[in-house]
């Protein structure tokens, strides 16, 4: 009996020994402060588009080259070089040139071809003037003639043949002939090969 009482006493003392009064307990640690993570808005990367450029060309050539790519789906270097070579043969990219070499305004060229591609037939020549009258451009200027050249129905008719790819300069000369209807071929094909060497695919 005495042993049992002693055991109960020790058990009570043990429980009391491990009990701690509430006022002696350390206060709980506060929760950690939230960490602010900066959120950056998602901005999709702009597509970087490469185009054919001609760093060594004259400003007039560079302008026409850029406009052709901006307003058509021509991406093939040979196709662009063919068009450029033909313009070089026709006018050397001089917009106010009348056939024979005279530099005159649109209404002062009385015979032969006129302008970038030497518009010769009465209808095509007159349509240049009508186009610029309707759209507020100068038919003697590089800008006005380039706009008309790209939008002219004859060019639009053969444009799909230039918008393909993988053809040679000689092959692209076929739609170029249908487009321009030249009488003398001259050096247009040689000029085209020269442009192929000068065109660079750049951002």
Language-model features and meaning:
Residues 75-76, 138:
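Alpha-helix N-cap/helix-initiation motif
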Residues 40-63, 91-166:
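Peptidoglycan-targeting cell-wall enzymes and recognition modules
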Residues 2-41, 125-203:
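Non-catalytic cell-wall polysaccharide-engagement segments
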Residues 58, 67-68, 78, 82:
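N-terminal carbohydrate-binding/catalytic regions of secreted carbohydrate-active enzymes
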Residues 70-74:
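Helix-boundary and loop/linker segments of multi-pass membrane transporters
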Residues 68-69, 132:
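Hydrophobic alpha-helix position signal
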Residues 77-94:
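Short, functionally critical alpha-helical segments immediately adjacent to catalytic or ligand/cofactor-binding
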């Amino acid at each position: 009996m005495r042993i049992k009482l002693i055991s109960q006493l020790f058990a009570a003392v043990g429980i009391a020994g491990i009990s701690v009064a509430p006022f002696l307990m350390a206060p709980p640690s506060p929760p950690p402060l939230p960490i602010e993570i900066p959120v950056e808005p998602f901005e999709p990367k702009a597509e970087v588009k490469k185009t054919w450029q001609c760093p060594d060309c004259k400003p007039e050539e560079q302008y026409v080259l850029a406009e052709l790519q901006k307003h058509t789906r021509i991406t093939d270097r040979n196709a662009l070089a063919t068009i450029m070579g033909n313009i070089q043969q026709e006018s050397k990219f001089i917009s106010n040139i009348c056939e024979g070499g005279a530099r005159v305004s649109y209404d002062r060229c009385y015979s032969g071809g006129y302008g970038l591609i030497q518009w010769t037939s009465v209808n095509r020549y007159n349509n240049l003037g009508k186009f610029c009258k309707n759209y507020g451009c100068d038919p003697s200027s590089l800008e006005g003639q380039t706009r008309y050249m790209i939008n002219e129905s004859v060019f639009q008719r053969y444009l799909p043949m230039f918008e393909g790819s993988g053809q040679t300069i000689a092959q692209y000369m076929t739609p170029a002939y249908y487009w321009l209807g030249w009488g003398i071929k001259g050096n247009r094909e040689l000029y085209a090969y020269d442009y192929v060497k000068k065109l660079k695919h750049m951002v």
